[in-house]
């Protein structure tokens, strides 16, 4: 594909005390095939990248080049082009929680969002941040997803785990289990089901069945194990069906999720973080990514954390970041339709 036709992606560096710099460097130096799909530009700290390039990968620091804006990037193989944001963070030790690193990780995301809002990049790929470090750095967001939603001014969004053609949409994410139960309410469930329906339509699958996992064991078993499935989820599924969305459920999660892994379902709605994340990561590992649906631009992330325990050792694998970059490049050209369809669904 001609370079003028491929999407420009902002790759945020994540927490520089973690594995973000080294997996970013490996992704851009060792996977030239990505450059035929996109123009990757790092948003972060060039010095932290140089430290990873020389100290972890054993490469020449000269491969890291600072550019003023994404349009200045040449996409030359064997280089890492960086839009510098903020002061150097090369002083931050690997593997230690750092307020400076947490502040930087949040700032990198905010800068990437600003570049997306101005039309300078077509999508965002995020390396992992550490939530405690981000909070120590003065940014009180539960995680990437909520920060991104704030930066783009959207209220209806969902964290989506994806592997191949399988998508796990989450009703709640980074809250306590107690708060997750109360968070599964009628409004939130209606909104997410509309998002799933819009996303499926934008992917050309408007009639695809959407499996909705029950909150309680056995989806409540006719109220034996709780009322939420009967009082909240079942009516929301009916409202979605009335609106032309092919939602099914609530279904027992221990039946629905294995069926989805075996290919029966492409779109699944789960109620809380670990109901989706635990089985997904057990099955897919590095073959999964995290997509935020409900934003005006595509955002895809690795499906792992900062791995402080191995940061700087060279043991980190870049497979998830490579996959996230590939998925963002694939989704970016059609994301305008995803966004417009989602907006139309939210307005209905």
Task: State each model region's role.
Residues 1-144, 187-271, 275-290, 295-300, ...:
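Contiguous, glycine/small-aliphatic-enriched amphipathic segments in soluble metabolic enzymes
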Residues 161-183, 187-191:
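Ligand-binding beta-strand-loop-alpha-helix segment within the catalytic cores
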Residues 136-158:
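Glycine/threonine-rich beta-strand-loop-alpha-helix active-site module
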Residues 150-168, 293-309:
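Short, flexible loop segments at boundaries between secondary-structure elements
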């Amino acid at each position: 594909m001609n370079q003028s036709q491929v999407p420009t992606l902002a790759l945020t560096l994540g927490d520089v005390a973690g594995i973000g710099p080294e997996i970013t460097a490996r992704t851009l130096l060792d996977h030239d095939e990505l450059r035929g799909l996109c123009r990757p530009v790092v948003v972060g700290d060039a010095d932290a990248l140089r430290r990873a390039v020389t100290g972890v990968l054993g490469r020449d620091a000269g491969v890291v080049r600072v550019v003023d804006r994404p349009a200045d990037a040449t996409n030359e193989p064997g280089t890492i082009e960086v839009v510098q944001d903020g002061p150097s963070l090369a002083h931050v030790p690997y593997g230690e929680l750092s307020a400076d690193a947490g502040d930087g990780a949040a700032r990198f995301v905010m800068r990437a969002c600003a570049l997306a809002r101005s039309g300078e990049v077509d999508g965002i790929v995020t390396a992992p941040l550490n939530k405690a470090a981000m909070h120590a750095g003065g940014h009180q967001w539960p995680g990437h997803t909520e920060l991104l939603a704030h930066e783009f001014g959207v209220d209806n969004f969902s964290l989506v785990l994806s592997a191949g053609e399988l998508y796990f949409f989450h009703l709640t994410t980074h809250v306590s289990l107690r708060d997750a139960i109360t968070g599964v309410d009628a409004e939130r469930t209606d909104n997410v089901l509309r998002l799933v329906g819009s996303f499926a339509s934008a992917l050309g699958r408007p009639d695809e069945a959407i499996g909705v996992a029950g909150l309680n064991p056995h989806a409540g078993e006719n109220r034996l194990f709780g009322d939420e499935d009967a009082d909240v989820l079942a009516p929301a599924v009916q409202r979605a069906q009335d609106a032309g969305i092919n939602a099914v459920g609530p279904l027992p999660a221990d039946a629905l999720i294995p069926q989805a892994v075996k290919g029966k379902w492409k779109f699944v709605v789960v109620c809380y973080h670990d109901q989706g994340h635990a089985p997904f990561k057990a099955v897919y590992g590095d073959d999964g990514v995290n997509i935020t649906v409900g934003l005006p631009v595509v955002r895809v992330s690795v499906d792992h954390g900062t791995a402080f325990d191995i940061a700087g050792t060279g043991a980190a694998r870049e497979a998830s970041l490579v996959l996230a970059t590939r998925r963002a490049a694939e989704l970016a050209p059609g994301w305008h339709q995803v966004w417009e369809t989602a907006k139309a669904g939210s307005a209905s």
